[in-house]
Curated annotation (Swiss-Prot), chain B:
This is D-alanyl carrier protein. The modification O-(pantetheine 4'-phosphoryl)serine is found at S34. GO terms for molecular function: D-alanyl carrier activity. GO terms for cellular component: cytoplasm. Pathway: Cell wall biogenesis; lipoteichoic acid biosynthesis. 4'-phosphopantetheine is transferred from CoA to a specific serine of apo-DCP. It holds the Pfam family PP-binding. Belongs to the DltC family. Keywords: Cell wall biogenesis/degradation, Cytoplasm, Phosphopantetheine, Phosphoprotein. It comes from the Bacteria. It is found in: Cytoplasm. Its main location: cytoplasm.
Length: 407, 79
């Protein structure tokens, strides 16, 4: 049973959450019940599938790695770089295997035996922890908290990507009734908002626009068809994913957790920089903190270049390409990453140009509207690439029997 | 120590505007951005022999000259 997919699921979830809500209102966390709930829902989602073993195996594997590194870094107080890199590589190995698998086994068959719903997202959690152990920010990894963090049910399929220290702080804090009432309020609202986004708006966009236009654009590509499919897909992507995120956050809120948000009016972004502070924020900030900033800091410390522009451009490329690869090893995911890197590099260059020429562009409603319009369209072009529709168009030209898109 | 920290901020950002108001938001005013923030981290780490991991740099705690000075002092005291 896919999370958040059927009314039945929500009914069961709602009923199951009632004891936790009551307990929190009475000032108690009911941790044993939370753990039971997590196990029960994981069971509902994964049982009867082979992937349940992948899920469990993955947890065991990551626990061994993280606990080893904790022992090495904290107990032994050693900090050799090569151990750090090795542990990071081991931690991402299952994910890499799962992503590379389709290259060797193309076609609609089952994916790698290591894969399970959420593997891409859980991997972020362990990698971040290893880095923070290295940095000395995490000085202890208590096993129970670690496992609950890893398998936290509301966010297991697609995030938002939480961070260990934040989660544990919340786990340990006592229940404060006013705070919980506020969280409960917001959580319920967000669940309803999620319904609106995913099951009404997203559904309607797909049913009456995206599904049909994607097929038309594939069979009879034209500027109009393709543009229309671009807007349809981008809007669908937002409402669907933002809707899911709202469910995940809302349910977590009901359980007493104030999870970080994923979207903040992304289509009002005035430039690509602003966009990445509004779109899939937990992913964007994860890459910023654990890839971009670390890489740039390494460049500067090791003095691989004196040129700040070169360093930041290489940083953007590495960051965005990695993000592209993380989505999957297809040409269009990689191009998506590369395109966003170019947007970031281009935007920085534009800022430098304005400064050099001393162009003072006024900041008013009109200029804001134009910047938003430009950013919106540049971003939607990236969504078109990401959607795979161009891939369908090309493949259909080569082989008319290639399967049509089925959004 | 505060003066040394402010000198470093000035070198990294290329401006001393922030000295007029040590509580102005350096990121909002464009005095600091992600790149300069990292340069700042590298310089501060070197100058005070402390460790400043990027993922710890919560912008809310690091966005004014005064806050930066306070954070560095805390780190120094930790060691």
């Amino acid at each position: 049973m896919q999370p958040y997919s059927t009314p039945f699921y929500f009914v069961i979830l709602g009923l199951a959450l009632i004891p936790i809500v009551i307990a929190q209102l009475l000032g108690k966390k009911l941790m044993w019940y939370q753990v039971l709930l997590t196990i029960a829902f994981l069971w509902l989602t994964f049982s009867g599938t082979v992937t349940i073993w992948a899920l469990i195996g993955f947890g065991v594997f990551q626990t061994i790695i993280v606990k080893f590194y904790e022992w090495y870094r904290v107990k032994q107080n050693k900090n050799q770089s090569f151990v750090f890199y090795l542990i990071i590589l081991l931690s991402i190995l299952p994910l890499v295997i799962v992503k590379v698998h389709p290259l060797f086994n193309p076609g609609p068959g089952p994916g790698s035996i290591l894969g399970f719903l959420g593997i891409s997202y859980i991997s972020f959690k362990t990698v971040a922890m290893i880095m923070e152990i290295r940095d000395g920010l995490i000085k202890a990894v208590p096993l129970k908290e670690f496992l609950y963090f890893l398998y936290f049910y509301p966010t297991i399929s697609s995030g938002p990507i939480d961070r260990f220290r934040r989660f544990v702080k919340e786990l340990k804090a006592p229940v404060v009734t006013e705070k919980y009432l506020d969280l409960l309020n917001k959580g319920v609202f967000r669940i309803f908002q999620g319904f609106l986004y995913k099951f009404i708006i997203g559904y309607l966009i797909d049913q009456y626009w995206l599904h049909g236009i994607a097929i038309s654009a594939t069979i009879h590509p034209s500027f109009l068809n393709v543009s229309s499919s671009m807007y349809a897909y981008g809007l669908y992507l937002f409402f669907d994913f933002a809707g899911y995120s709202l469910f995940a956050i809302g349910v977590s809120n009901l359980m007493g957790y104030d999870l970080p948000h994923n979207f903040n009016k992304p289509f009002l972004a005035k430039n690509i920089h602003d966009f990445w502070q509004r779109w899939h924020m937990t992913l964007s900030f994860w890459f910023r903190d654990f890839v971009f900033m670390r890489l740039v800091k390494t460049f500067m410390v090791k003095k691989w270049s004196k040129n700040m522009i070169t360093i930041s451009n290489v940083g953007y490329l590495a960051n965005m390409l990695l993000m592209g690869f993380w989505h999957g090893l297809t040409w269009y995911y990689i191009l998506y990453g590369f395109y966003h890197a170019m947007l970031m590099i281009g935007y920085d260059a534009w800022k430098r140009l304005k400064k050099r020429k001393n162009w003072k562009i006024p900041d008013n409603k009109w200029t804001s509207a134009i910047s938003i319009f430009i950013t919106f369209n540049l971003v939607f072009i990236s969504f078109l690439i990401f959607s795979g529709i161009p891939n369908h168009i090309i493949m259909h030209c080569i082989d008319p029997h290639f399967p049509l898109p089925n959004f | 120590m505060k003066e040394q920290i402010f000198d470093i901020i000035e070198t990294v950002s290329g401006t001393d505007e922030f000295r007029e108001d040590l509580d102005m938001d350096l990121f909002e005013e464009g005095i600091l951005d992600s790149m300069r923030a990292i340069m700042l981290i590298v310089e501060l780490e070197g100058a005070f022999d402390i460790s400043l991991p990027p993922s710890e740099m919560d912008r809310e705690d690091w966005n004014t000259a005064n806050k930066i000075a306070a954070r560095v002092q805390e780190k120094k005291d930790e060691n």
